[in-house]
Amino acid sequence: MAKQQDVRPIIKLRSTAGTGYTYVTRKNRRNNPDRLVLKKYDPVVRKHVDFREER
């Protein structure tokens, strides 16, 4: 069973281009308490765009 407040939860990164494309990753809550923003490739628009953490 997973702990209630897991240190490394699984999060979804949703594209800011509005395509609905998502990546799934893990993050360390102690080192990064704020929402994560990564620049990754969105194959729908065929560009690198910002992906923001979705809660």
From Swiss-Prot:
Q: SUPFAM superfamilies given for it?
A: Zn-binding ribosomal proteins
One GO biological process term is: translation
Q: Which GO terms describe its cellular component?
A: cytosolic large ribosomal subunit
Organism domain of life: Bacteria
- Alphabetically ordered keywords of this record: Ribonucleoprotein, Ribosomal protein
| UniProt GO MF annotations | structural constituent of ribosome
Which HAMAP family does the UniProt record give?
A: Ribosomal_bL33
Which family does the record claim for this protein?
Answer: Belongs to the bacterial ribosomal protein bL33 family.
- Descriptive protein name: Large ribosomal subunit protein bL33
Q: Which gene encodes it?
A: rpmG
